[in-house]
Structures are given as structure tokens and as C-alpha cells.
UniProtKB/Swiss-Prot annotation:
Domain observations: The conserved DXD motif is involved in enzyme activity.
InterPro entries in UniProt: A1-4-GlycosylTfrase_dom, Glycosyltransf_32, GlycoTrfase_DXD_sugar-bd_CS, Nucleotide-diphossugar_trans
Pfam families linked to this entry: Gb3_synth, Gly_transf_sug
Name of the coding gene: A4galt
Protein known as: Lactosylceramide 4-alpha-galactosyltransferase
A GO CC term assigned to this protein in UniProt: membrane
Source organism phylogeny: Eukaryota, Metazoa, Chordata, Craniata, Vertebrata
Length: 359
């Protein structure tokens, strides 16, 4: 085609006068130049979206962890309640990190007589082919923790999300994993009822007295990182309908926090959120209940705090959301006085012991 900068890398690394000559060239040359620039731009955008969705690369030390863990002696009563506390892993990851372990352990310790069910999409149905890693080994120490495979097609079956999922699984979208997680938690609670928690929560108190409840993140938006609902509740049915009717997988949060906010405002016939609100049997608790530290201030979790200040900060908190999307990759010294380290030591001591041993 008579273009002197023929290869992609060469084209984008030439000085500006080369690019100017190409832009002044024949129509074919200009089309080719536009294609190269567009390709490089889209490639960069794809990388940024991936990092925004999945996060930065994990700490390499996690890949050298042992696969077995010596369980401590645990005095847990016999499980009497049905499986009503759920954690979901909708990616193919099957090796829980330390925050994931702490989330599940803290829930198990706060609810010793209830089943804490961890559903993981990457787990095979064949129980003889289960992965061996530190996270699975440690969580298996707790008699009330059940780790099971997650079949998304089966989960969405007989819900308004079935047709959506059959199409969505075959197309690319920038926020595919978060959207899938948003869909799964609503379908799960609609089908079975109970409590759902994100895997970056640390549970401080028993949550079983909370029914048909969610949390306010800020004055503008609710958050679905914690949800507690009865089986087949009408509010969840409206969420399922809105998920499909107003679907947009290209806007961050549109199918999650924004969806819950839209439905809640319609449910309560309100225009804006208050500090807390309850109507028609559904309660939105104030930010201090689950989001005592706003996401903008996530670094506070890694700052030192006195035990007295910690108690005062979390006095009205049921569970602490750590904003893993922002904080992942940040080094935490397990023996420090950092807020997060103190939470680990107090509410997930088994995970904390493993952190001190291996980090």
C-alpha cells in the first residue's frame, strides 16, 4: 500500500511527522492509519476495563502457600438451622484469598448453629476432583461451612434471568463478572431466601435478626454486598424483572447498586434516599451498619487505630465491607495495629494465624 510504517509497533512508535504523512496520504492510507489507531485505542481500553473489573495482579506470595492446614480445636454446636448464609464466587477461581477466608470464618463464628454455604462456579461436580489449596483446607475446618459447586444455568432456571443468561454467556461485555455476581445473588435469595454476603465482608455480629433488609452505602445509592430476604419476596421479584427490563451491561453498577436503588425508590415511592428507611416490610439500614468507612476512604483499613477508637467506630456495625476492589494488593502486616489486622485477629483468628505464618 506504499505505507512506510507497515507494522503496528513501528507505526505507533514513529515520530509525529510519520503519522502526519500517513494522514495526508491516499484514502487507503488514511483508512489504514485510522484502523491502526483505533485498534491500539481499543486494546488499551480493554486492558483498563479488565483491571477495573478484575483488579491488579495478585500478590505472588499467594501462589507459594501450602495446600494443607492444621485445624484448631473448635467447639461448635450441632448445626440446626438450614443453609441460609451464602457466599458466591462466580468467576472460575477456586483458591480463596485471606480476605475471602476471613469473611467466611467470621460468618461461621457469628452463626455457629447455621450453615454457611460457599458456592463456587469453578468447582467440579465430581467430589473426588476437588482442588487442594490453603483456603479450601482452612475453611473446611469449620463444621458449619459447606463448600459446593455453583451451576449458574441451574440457578437461573425458572427465573426471569434464564433467557438473559443463555444469551449473555456467549457475548462479551466489559463488566461481565460483576454483572453475573449481581444476577446470582438476587436469584439465589429469591429461590432459597437467607443472607447473602460479598467475600470482602468481615462479620462482627449475628445477622439472623435481619430480614428483608439491605444497606445504604451513601445518600445516593444502596449496595447489594449484604442482602437478607425471605424466599420469593416480592421485592426480589421486582429486582429480577428490572434486571432484564432495564438491562445495560456497559455501565458500572447499573445491574447492582443502581438496580437496587431504582427498585427501592419505586417500592417506597420516594425520590431520594434518607439515612435509613423502611417501608412495606423492607428496611434499608444506614451506612454505619455495613459500610462504616466509605469506599473513598478505604485506606483507613490499613492505618493504625487504637482498640478504643475501633470499638467506637464500629459500635453500630453488623459487618464491615472492606472494599476489596480498591484495597486488593495493598500489603497488610498481620501483627500490626492496622484496623483491618485488628479485625482479622478478633473475628477470624484462624485465618489471622495463617496470615502470620505465611505472609
Amino acid at each position: 500500500m506504499g505505507i512506510s510504517c507497515s507494522h503496528l509497533e513501528e507505526t505507533m512508535s514513529k515520530p509525529p511527522d510519520c503519522l502526519l504523512r500517513m494522514l495526508r496520504g491516499t484514502p487507503r492510507q488514511r483508512v489504514f492509519t485510522f484502523f491502526i489507531i483505533s485498534f491500539k485505542f481499543m486494546f488499551l481500553i480493554s486492558i483498563l476495563i479488565y483491571w477495573h473489573t478484575v483488579g491488579a495482579p495478585k500478590d505472588q506470595r499467594e501462589y507459594s502457600l501450602p495446600v494443607d492446614f492444621s485445624c484448631p480445636q473448635l467447639a461448635f454446636p450441632r448445626v440446626s438451622a438450614p443453609g441460609n448464609i451464602f457466599f458466591l464466587e462466580t468467576s472460575d477461581r477456586t483458591s480463596p484469598n485471606f480476605l475471602f477466608m476471613c469473611s467466611v470464618e467470621s460468618a461461621a463464628r457469628a452463626h455457629p448453629e447455621s450453615q454457611v454455604v460457599v458456592l463456587m462456579k469453578g468447582l467440579p461436580r465430581d467430589t473426588t476432583a476437588q482442588p487442594r489449596n490453603l483456603g479450601i483446607s482452612l475453611l473446611s475446618c469449620f463444621p458449619n461451612v459447606w463448600i459446593r459447586p455453583l451451576d449458574l444455568q441451574e440457578l437461573f432456571e425458572d427465573t426471569p434471568l434464564a433467557a438473559w443468561y443463555s444469551e449473555a454467556r456467549h457475548r462479551w461485555e466489559p463488566y461481565q463478572l460483576p454483572v453475573l455476581s449481581d444476577a446470582s445473588r438476587i436469584a439465589l435469595l429469591w429461590k432459597f431466601g437467607g443472607i447473602y454476603l460479598d467475600t470482602d465482608f468481615i462479620v462482627l455480629k449475628n445477622l439472623l435478626n435481619l430480614t428483608n433488609t439491605l444497606g445504604i452505602q451513601s445518600r445516593y445509592v444502596l449496595n447489594g454486598a449484604f442482602l437478607a430476604f425471605e424466599r420469593k419476596h416480592e421485592f426480589l421479584a421486582l429486582c429480577l424483572h428490572d434486571f432484564v427490563a432495564n438491562y445495560n451491561g456497559w455501565i458500572w453498577g447499573h445491574q447492582g447498586p443502581q438496580l437496587l436503588t431504582r427498585v427501592f425508590k419505586k417500592w417506597c415511592s420516594i425520590q431520594s434516599l434518607e439515612k435509613s428507611h423502611a417501608c412495606r416490610g423492607v428496611t434499608a439500614l444506614p451506612p454505619e451498619a455495613f459500610y462504616p468507612i466509605p469506599w473513598q476512604n478505604w485506606k483507613k483499613y490499613f492505618e493504625d487505630i487504637s482498640p478504643e477508637e475501633l470499638t467506637q467506630l464500629l459500635n453500630a456495625t453488623y459487618a464491615v465491607h472492606v472494599w476489596n476492589k480498591k484495597s486488593q494488593g495493598t500489603h497488610l502486616e498481620a501483627t500490626s495495629k492496622a484496623l483491618l489486622a485488628q479485625l482479622h485477629a478478633r473475628y477470624c483468628p484462624t485465618t489471622h494465624r495463617a496470615m502470620k505464618m505465611y505472609l
